[in-house]
Amino acid sequence: MPILTDFKAIATGLFVTWKHIFRRPVTVEYPEVKRTPAPRYRARIVLTRDPDGGERCVACYLCSAACPVDCISMEAAEGEEGRRYARWFRINFSRCIFCGLCAEACPTLAIQMTPDYEICERDIMELVYEKEDLLIDGCGKDAGYNFYRHAGIGVAQPRGAGECEEEPVDVRGLMP
């Protein structure tokens, strides 16, 4: 009986091999043929600007606190008009796992993920990107958003006076 079970195991293995031998290969010749990522693919991190051209990052440290591998570091500074900004901002892409938690934690939408997945360097120190390397000229996905224009609107205005906010309904006036 053990000979029959061995023969059956060999026949099953050969059947699986012959079944796959005539299929097309799934290997992609990467440098020559580049795959297009999915529409919602997240890869390289960039820092975006406001519509008026200023930096969006206010150095609140929420991105570095949300990062599970601690690859984001920065130093906060304050401008002449009292506006906070990041004096230096650094991301170590050799440690980054591209989870996107930093982009979700950013209250100013300064950190955004792009589908650029080609981050290859021979020296590991070249994977440490400074603020100048990360800043892009555009606003990214949220072109009309300006943190300082939207921050504190609900505090200074009565209910119903904010952007895209309806007037409150007086519930007592609806009663008979």
UniProtKB/Swiss-Prot annotation:
InterPro entries: 4Fe4S_Fe-S-bd (IPR017896), 4Fe4S_Fe_S_CS (IPR017900), NADH_quinone_OxRdtase_chainI (IPR010226). Its EC number is 7.1.1.-. Its cofactor is [4Fe-4S] cluster. Pfam families: Fer4_7. PROSITE patterns: 4FE4S_FER_1, 4FE4S_FER_2. SUPFAM superfamilies: 4Fe-4S ferredoxins. The keyword Nuclease does not apply. The keyword Zinc does not apply. It is a peripheral membrane protein. One of its GO terms (biological process) is aerobic respiration. [4Fe-4S] cluster 1 binds at C57, C60, C63, C106. [4Fe-4S] cluster 2 binds at C67, C96, C99, C102. Binds 2 [4Fe-4S] clusters per subunit. GO terms for cellular component: plasma membrane. It is found in: Cell inner membrane. Gene3D superfamilies: 3.30.70.3270. One of its GO terms (molecular function) is quinone binding. Belongs to the complex I 23 kDa subunit family. HAMAP family: NDH1_NuoI (MF_01351). NDH-1 shuttles electrons from NADH, via FMN and iron-sulfur (Fe-S) centers, to quinones in the respiratory chain. The immediate electron acceptor for the enzyme in this species is believed to be ubiquinone. Couples the redox reaction to proton translocation (for every two electrons transferred, four hydrogen ions are translocated across the cytoplasmic membrane), and thus conserves the redox energy in a proton gradient. This is NADH-quinone oxidoreductase subunit I 2. It comes from Geobacter sulfurreducens (strain ATCC 51573 / DSM 12127 / PCA). The lineage of its organism: Bacteria, Pseudomonadati, Thermodesulfobacteriota, Desulfuromonadia, Geobacterales. The gene is nuoI2.
